[in-house]
Swiss-Prot record:
Protein's UniProt name: Meiotically up-regulated gene 111 protein
One BP term from GO: meiotic cell cycle
GO cellular component terms, semicolon-separated: plasma membrane
Keyword entries, A-Z: Meiosis, Membrane, Transmembrane, Transmembrane helix
Residues spanning the membrane: 13-33, 59-79, 92-112, 116-136, 158-178, 190-210, 285-305, 330-350, 356-376, 382-402, 417-437, 446-466
GO molecular function: transmembrane transporter activity
Keyword Transmembrane included in the entry's annotation: yes
Function: Has a role in meiosis.
Its membrane topology: Multi-pass membrane protein
Record bears the keyword Membrane: yes
Record localization: Membrane
Length: 468
């Protein structure tokens, strides 16, 4: 059991939550405006009107996302080793450095767009490369899950972090759209850059301070921080050793070591049966959970590419697209608020997570089909419902954290990071290709893939619901 001093020296949950909220909010303020910046850069590069860069924008944005997650997939083993042998905070720091380069390169490209129009591809792909190599995405998610185990936080830590990401994804684009009505694109980048930098300098240094103090107390007391399960197993075996076995041991005259000893044979068979039943009920759902996690990661890029659908196919303005994105994330905020409330009162159980995931994926299948018939008037309402139903991130990440064994968590964090990066790496090019095909032929081709993914996810969630 962790000592009282060690518990006091753990990084404050409020500190981590506040830092993560401000960090994600400042970065997501440019989630839609970066599409406008890419449009401007490509229009300058090809010397064509901005309305004619639609197909080039979809190809470049898909290629940049593909590059980012390809690099993120390659560096997963490196960051997994760092997380295991050094500290999870290293990935948090490198991710911040990658985001800082995003702000730096974007600001310079706006300032010198007319002087260096040929640098469009360098700016776009260098940002994608450095965001990927810095650990943004899969490696960062694995780091937060490792922090949960490192400081003995409960699984609700993962649920709250994923909920905060959705909250910031709602607040950020909404603030960005409002500010863009009053300030220029350059000023918006400078404002978000300043918030992002100051937030890290203040909060993360405090977190590192608490982390070092916690680790020093743990080392002094000889506590294996990441191997607490071994201590629990020792205590479990001690509790399940009956007094009769201790009483009979002197009378057996050393026969306990013999395989013919009925006492030792009975105990061995009993523990073997207990472990077999435990493993069967605990580890068997893990493949289904990981399959649901993979399908959820496949679905993630859909609405990001749908923003391009709104810009190019539906001919909506950047302010309208930003507003619709905010409405979608507001729906996600509603769902995550319910998850946070249930987590706070202790009602967000594993069964509740499974049920939420099943209902969410089933409803999302229907809404994606209806999105094909959406108009400019009905799209905000559909975006709201899509945000409500598709926000199963806290549930799926909570299930992964709940079902992963505690004895060797790094193996599973590495595997889930590889799954997430692989899914996004596969999904982006196929959905982008479907979007390009829909520009030339039929718009419904863009919606077929996400509908099939949601159907498979619904079936997997239904199978998972039958296991404890």
């Amino acid at each position: 059991m962790l000592s009282k001093k060690m518990k006091i020296c753990r990084p404050s949950l409020v500190l981590i939550y506040l830092w993560y909220l401000v960090d994600c909010t400042s970065f997501s303020m440019n989630s839609v405006t970066c599409l406008r910046l890419m449009q401007l850069l490509l229009a300058k590069y090809y010397q064509i009107p901005i309305d004619l860069v639609g197909e080039k924008l979809s190809i470049v944005s898909a290629s940049s996302c593909l590059l980012q997650y390809l690099v993120a997939l390659v560096v997963v083993p490196f960051y997994s080793t760092i997380i295991k042998k050094l500290t999870p905070w290293f990935t948090v720091f490198t991710t911040w450095v990658g985001e800082e380069y995003f702000f730096f390169a974007s600001t310079l490209s706006i300032l010198y767009m007319d002087d260096f129009p040929t640098c469009a591809y360098f700016v776009i792909f260098s940002i994608s490369f450095l965001l990927g190599i810095s650990g943004t995405g899969p490696s960062l998610n694995a780091s937060y899950k490792s922090l949960c185990k490192l400081y003995s936080y409960e699984n609700s830590f993962i649920v709250v972090l994923n909920s905060i990401f959705v909250v910031s994804s709602c607040i950020g684009p909404f603030l960005g759209s409002i500010l863009l009505l009053r300030v220029s694109l350059l000023q918006l980048y400078l404002i978000s850059w300043t918030i992002h930098f100051i937030n890290f300098v203040f909060h993360s240094l405090l977190a590192v301070f608490f982390s070092s103090k916690y680790t020093s107390y743990a080392q002094k007391e000889g506590q294996p921080i990441l191997n607490a399960t071994e201590n629990l197993e020792v205590e479990y075996n001690a509790l399940n050793t009956t007094p009769s076995s201790f009483e009979e041991q002197p009378l057996l005259n050393g026969l306990n070591d013999s395989p013919r000893n009925p006492v030792s044979r009975t105990n061995a068979e009993g523990f073997k049966a207990l472990n077999a039943s435990f493993d069967g009920s605990y580890k068997f759902p893990i493949p289904i959970v990981l399959l649901c996690f993979f399908l959820y990661s496949l679905l993630t890029p859909f609405f990001d590419i749908h923003l391009q659908f709104q810009l190019i196919v539906m001919h909506m303005s950047i302010v309208q697209v930003g507003f619709i994105n905010s409405v979608k994330t507001f729906g996600s905020l509603l769902t995550c608020s319910v998850c946070l409330f249930l987590t706070y009162v202790g009602g967000f159980s594993v069964h509740m997570m499974k049920t939420t995931m099943l209902i969410g994926l089933t409803a999302t299948t229907l809404i994606i089909f209806i999105l094909y018939f959406a108009t400019a008037q009905t799209l905000p309402c559909l975006a709201l419902f899509y945000g409500i139903t598709s926000s199963i991130g806290p549930s799926i990440h909570g299930l992964v954290a709940a079902y992963v064994p505690n004895d060797k968590p790094h193996r599973y964090w590495k595997f889930t990071a590889l799954l997430e990066a692989s899914a996004t790496f596969i999904s982006y090019p196929f959905q982008s290709l479907a979007f390009i095909v829909c520009l030339k032929y039929c718009s419904f081709y863009f919606f077929i893939g996400p509908i099939c993914i949601c159907l498979l996810g619904s079936i997997s969630s239904y199978l998972l619901l039958g296991y404890h």
